[in-house]
Amino acid sequence: MQSVCSLDCAIHSSKKARAWAAKEDRKTTRVKLEKLKTRSTWMKEAQREFNRYIRERDRVAGFGCISSGRALDWSGNATDAGHFRSVGSAPHLRFNEDNCHAQSKHANRYLSGDAVNYRMRLIERIGLERVEALEADQTPRHYDISDLKAIKEKYKKMARELKKNAA
């Protein structure tokens, strides 16, 4: 049985079939790559989305650097999402929104977070009670891959909503 009527139709049908096969191949490759991701990779991706949300939250609110109080450069890559209690010393607070705020790269990286000024401005922003609760929080939190996937999707969606509502 003939499936095409002419040479032109055969060429078109062949191109269409190849495009469909390539699309299916990309889909299966993407699924295989997702399965190969380690917990560490998921942690990095979740942290990236969380940090993006924090920067967007503080940009929309019009906040400056949490340490210096200066206006931040939102146009380039000069703003970090700085943690009050560092991820190294308090990994259980890495996804805590009270623990993370927009901060200049200078304060975050070269002044080691400028913790004294960070704390003073954090008290102004969220209050002494919440800062003390943050400092006292030693509850261990262990994130498995499914938790990290959920965190990544949650903050990706929240950042998208903030950006859409701000526009």
Residue ranges and their predicted role:
Residues 7-8, 65-69, 106:
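Short, cysteine/histidine-rich loop/knuckle motifs that typically chelate Zn2+
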Residues 137-167:
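Short flanking/linker segments adjacent to small metal-binding domains or redox-active Cys/His motifs
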Residues 1-13:
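Cysteine-rich micro-motifs
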Residues 1-4, 60, 95-99:
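Flanking scaffold residues of small Cys/His-coordinated metal-binding clusters
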Residues 11, 15, 74-79, 113:
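Short, non-ligating residues that shape and space the ligands of small metal-coordination modules
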Residues 29-30, 88-99, 109-145:
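Polybasic, low-complexity binding patches
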Residues 64-100:
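Histidine-centered nuclease catalytic patch
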Residues 26-64, 142-145:
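Short, charged surface segments at domain edges that flank catalytic/cofactor-binding sites
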